[in-house]
């Protein structure tokens, strides 16, 4: 038997090798895939942890009092000889007690029954998950096998996703608004607050404060789950795969970390904002995207891996030739055009206070018929319109859901009601942003304009009440608003191409023109963290993530080393044109009164020497004046002369105009910026000379102005005075011919090698003896 076992093992191994080779031939594409290429997961446990959930359950149950509960007289201390709860009431800071594992069984048998409202509130999140599950359209059955590898999956929250920094303020606003400060109220997500109050009101009556807060947090906080990946297989292994993985379902997952996608959108936003200040925004954005890397990967590859409905990310994806989303977002409502006769046209309305005081506020409206899909959380549907008139609105929404906010978003999207577009709100508008805020504020307080636009009817079968609550009993109902009886998907029948305009507007191709999708000047966003590992050293927007010293150093290096860039920068600061470094300049210089004096000096220098930008020393001086000219001025104070030096804002670094100390130092042969030599004249000394010493007093040799001057005079030895010291140079003199020097070097190397060989041989013989 011992002799037969190796033969059997060999046969088994050969059979396995043949099976493996057969699988490789049948599906070469699948075999070449990496496990990170898959986005389908098998969920086999309800635990959020990834290690032995059943063992943790065992350890919890084995405790004498595994359950904590609020004190209740309905549960006795002892029942049929079994102790149900402990006598200790205070556990830490909460008034709770511990109970036996059988207490839930006792309560289900003898406890009081709660109301249906409380049950529905507690099961609200789980009901939504079940509804989503059964509304999913399943694809055809696929077989798979498990790999011992898990990937992080972002689980979307049930109610609404809230920024992690806003979650504590949102919860404070829900549970104890009387203790919140104005700053905390501003940071809270008010949309989530209203939804949470409706859901949590019945729960707070039966749950403890800690438990209710925990439930509320889980409804608005997105968490990561580590789920194992599933790898597709070939028919050869289908039987085994079906046996192993028959009881699983596929769940919709997001393999990208949403916080990572937001950080990339933050980076894209900084790039777009700075590119818009350049003379060629589109070319500038594309050129800089090609120079940026994130964790060693080019920006183009990173953008290809991240998709979504974030606006700045969409602009950069289109700039790189990639696709993006088809939706436009207004506040919390997403819109997607299903079909339309023409793209939305722009109308510029001019409001005049006097012949000399006018403001132009543009808005967009439909021309002809259009059908648009919209979605706001659980509220979705579509509306049909003709020009600025709504024909009908089909909506699917929960019962008694307030629809004021999404309906106002619809009215703003299509410019359907007034005032807000052709009419003012009783005062002269200062700008578009203020006009938009006034639109929502005005119509939120009084939605009479929407009711007049749609009309009222006594047909009580209609679902929308005059208070704009869904299926609320009322004496009259809103016309032309009906319930959506079939599912609508926001997909168009034809694939449309994306076009990036010169001002970084994103358009979609329409048979009759271009449809505006993303306008960067209308995006409202706040600064957020950049993706880790971002390298901006190759781009011209290196100031995005640096401190004042590094920003100033990068700016001055670019202007001192590049003549054309310095000429453009000085011209932009002098004429008050937009420049990529405008934000950097305003962040470096304190608010001052030196602007007019700096501009006057710049004009004098340019007039006296038109070729000033060819000299690096003049570029350094002009950069100093241009930075002051482009800084923020204090208009309430009298203008003063340019100072010789000033401190950079937020630091103790001095910037000197004459470049004798501080940030920029100019020696006779070097220009040093931030301790780094950026320009050196006569590097290495004149040709044919070598530096032989540095002295505090003048040595016995001829003193010249520059090393080139000494070279032109043909001196064998001379010195140059620089920075209080004397640098001595001597002419290189060789007493041998060049060929003799080479031959002597080779001979000396051979002699050295022979000597080492002899010494090694002698040492070996000495050891043997």
Curated annotation (Swiss-Prot):
<comment type="function">
    <text>subunit of the RNA-dependent RNA polymerase which is responsible for replication and transcription of virus RNA segments. The transcription of viral mRNAs occurs by a unique mechanism called cap-snatching. 5' methylated caps of cellular mRNAs are cleaved after 10-13 nucleotides by PA. In turn, these short capped RNAs are used as primers by PB1 for transcription of viral mRNAs. During virus replication, PB1 initiates RNA synthesis and copy vRNA into complementary RNA (cRNA) which in turn serves as a template for the production of more vRNAs.</text>
</comment>
<comment type="subunit">
    <text>RNA polymerase is composed of three subunits: PA, PB1 and PB2.</text>
</comment>
<dbReference type="InterPro" id="IPR048838">
    <property type="entry name" value="PB2_627_dom"/>
</dbReference>
<dbReference type="GO" id="GO:0075526">
    <property type="term" value="P:cap snatching"/>
</dbReference>
<dbReference type="GO" id="GO:0042025">
    <property type="term" value="C:host cell nucleus"/>
</dbReference>
<dbReference type="InterPro" id="IPR048837">
    <property type="entry name" value="PB2_cap-bd"/>
</dbReference>
<dbReference type="Pfam" id="PF20950">
    <property type="entry name" value="Flu_PB2_4th"/>
</dbReference>
<dbReference type="Pfam" id="PF21490">
    <property type="entry name" value="PB2_cap-binding"/>
</dbReference>
<feature type="short sequence motif" description="Nuclear localization signal">
    <location>
        <begin position="753"/>
        <end position="756"/>
    </location>
</feature>
<keyword id="KW-1048">Host nucleus</keyword>
<keyword id="KW-0946">Virion</keyword>
<protein>
    <recommendedName>
        <fullName>Polymerase basic protein 2</fullName>
    </recommendedName>
</protein>
<dbReference type="InterPro" id="IPR049113">
    <property type="entry name" value="PB2_helical"/>
</dbReference>
<keyword id="KW-1157">Cap snatching</keyword>
<comment type="similarity">
    <text>Belongs to the influenza viruses PB2 family.</text>
</comment>
<dbReference type="GO" id="GO:0044423">
    <property type="term" value="C:virion component"/>
</dbReference>
<keyword id="KW-0507">mRNA processing</keyword>
<dbReference type="Pfam" id="PF21442">
    <property type="entry name" value="PB2_627-dom"/>
</dbReference>
<dbReference type="GO" id="GO:0006370">
    <property type="term" value="P:7-methylguanosine mRNA capping"/>
</dbReference>
<keyword id="KW-0506">mRNA capping</keyword>
């Amino acid at each position: 038997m011992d002799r037969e076992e190796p033969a059997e093992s060999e046969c088994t191994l050969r059979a396995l090798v043949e099976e493996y080779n057969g699988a490789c031939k049948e599906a070469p594409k699948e075999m070449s895939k990496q496990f990170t290429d898959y986005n389908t997961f098998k969920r086999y446990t309800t635990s959020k942890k990834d290690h032995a959930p059943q063992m943790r359950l065992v350890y919890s149950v084995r405790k004498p009092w595994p359950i904590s509960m609020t004190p209740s007289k309905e549960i006795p201390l002892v029942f049929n000889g079994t102790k149900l709860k402990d006598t200790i009431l205070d556990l830490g800071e909460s008034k709770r007690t511990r109970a036996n594992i059988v207490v839930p069984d006792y309560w289900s048998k003898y406890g009081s029954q709660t109301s249906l409202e409380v049950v529905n509130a507690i099961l609200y999140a789980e009901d939504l998950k079940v509804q989503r599950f059964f509304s999913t359209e399943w694809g055809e059955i696929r077989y798979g096998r498990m790999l011992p590898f898990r990937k992080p999956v972002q689980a979307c929250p049930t109610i609404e996703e809230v920024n992690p920094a806003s979650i504590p303020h949102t919860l404070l606003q829900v549970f104890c608004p009387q203790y919140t400060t104005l700053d905390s109220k501003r940071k809270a997500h008010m949309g989530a607050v209203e939804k949470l109050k409706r859901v949590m009101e019945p729960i707070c009556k039966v749950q403890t404060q800690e438990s209710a807060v925990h439930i509320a947090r889980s409804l608005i906080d997105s968490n990561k789950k580590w789920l194992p990946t599933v790898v597709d297989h070939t028919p050869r292994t289908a039987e085994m795969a079906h046996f192993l993985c028959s009881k699983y379902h596929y769940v919709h997952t997001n393999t990208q970390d949403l916080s990572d996608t937001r950080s990339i959108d933050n980076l894209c936003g900084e790039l777009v904002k700075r590119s818009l200040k350049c003379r060629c925004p589109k070319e500038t954005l594309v050129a800089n995207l090609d120079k940026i890397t994130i964790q060693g990967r080019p920006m183009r590859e990173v953008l290809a891996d991240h998709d979504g409905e974030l606006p700045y990310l969409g602009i950069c994806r289109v700039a790189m030739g990639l696709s993006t989303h088809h939706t436009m977002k207004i506040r919390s409502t997403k819109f997607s055009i299903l079909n339309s006769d023409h793209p939305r046209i722009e109308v510029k309305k001019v409001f005049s206070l006097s012949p000399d005081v006018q403001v132009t506020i543009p808005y967009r409206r439909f021309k002809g018929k259009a059908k648009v899909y919209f979605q706001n959380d659980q509220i979705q549907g579509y509306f049909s319109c003709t020009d600025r008139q709504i024909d009908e609105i089909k909506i699917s929404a929960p019962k008694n859901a307030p629809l004021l906010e999404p309906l106002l978003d619809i009215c703003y999207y299509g410019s359907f009601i007034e005032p807000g577009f052709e009419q003012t709100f009783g005062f002269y508008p200062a700008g578009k942003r203020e006009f938009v805020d006034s639109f929502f504020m005005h119509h939120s307080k009084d939605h009479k304009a929407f009711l007049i636009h749609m009309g009222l009817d006594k047909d009580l079968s209609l679902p929308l009440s005059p208070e704009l609550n869904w299926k609320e009993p009322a004496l009259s109902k809103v016309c032309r608003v009906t319930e959506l009886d079939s599912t609508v998907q926001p997909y168009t029948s034809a694939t449309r191409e994306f076009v990036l305009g010169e001002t970084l507007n994103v358009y979609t191709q329409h048979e009759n023109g271009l449809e505006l999708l993303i306008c960067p000047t209308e995006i409202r966003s706040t600064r957020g963290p950049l993706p880790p590992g971002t390298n901006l050293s190759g781009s011209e927007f290196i100031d995005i993530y640096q401190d004042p010293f590094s920003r100033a150093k990068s700016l001055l290096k670019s202007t001192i080393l590049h003549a054309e860039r310095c000429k453009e920068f000085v011209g932009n600061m002098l004429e008050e044109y937009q420049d990529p470094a405008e934000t950097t300049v305003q962040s470096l210089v304190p608010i001052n009164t030196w602007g007019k004096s700096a501009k006057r000096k710049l004009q004098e220098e340019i007039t006296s020497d038109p070729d000033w930008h060819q000299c690096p020393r003049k570029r350094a001086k002009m950069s100093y004046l241009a930075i002051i000219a482009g800084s923020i001025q204090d208009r309430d104070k009298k203008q003063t002369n340019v100072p010789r030096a000033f401190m950079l804002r937020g630091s103790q670094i001095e910037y000197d105009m004459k470049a004798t100390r501080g940030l920029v130092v100019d020696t006779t042969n070097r220009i040093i910026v931030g301790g780094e030599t950026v320009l050196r004249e006569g590097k290495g000394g004149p040709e044919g000379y070598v530096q032989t010493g540095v002295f505090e007093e003048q040595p016995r040799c001829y003193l010249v102005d520059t090393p080139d001057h000494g070279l032109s005079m043909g001196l064998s030895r001379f010195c140059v005075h620089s920075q209080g010291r004397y640098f001595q140079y001597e002419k290189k003199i060789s007493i041998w011919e060049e060929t003799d020097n080479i031959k002597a070097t080779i001979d000396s190397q051979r002699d050295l090698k022979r000597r080492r060989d002899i010494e090694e041989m002698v040492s070996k013989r000495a050891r043997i003896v």
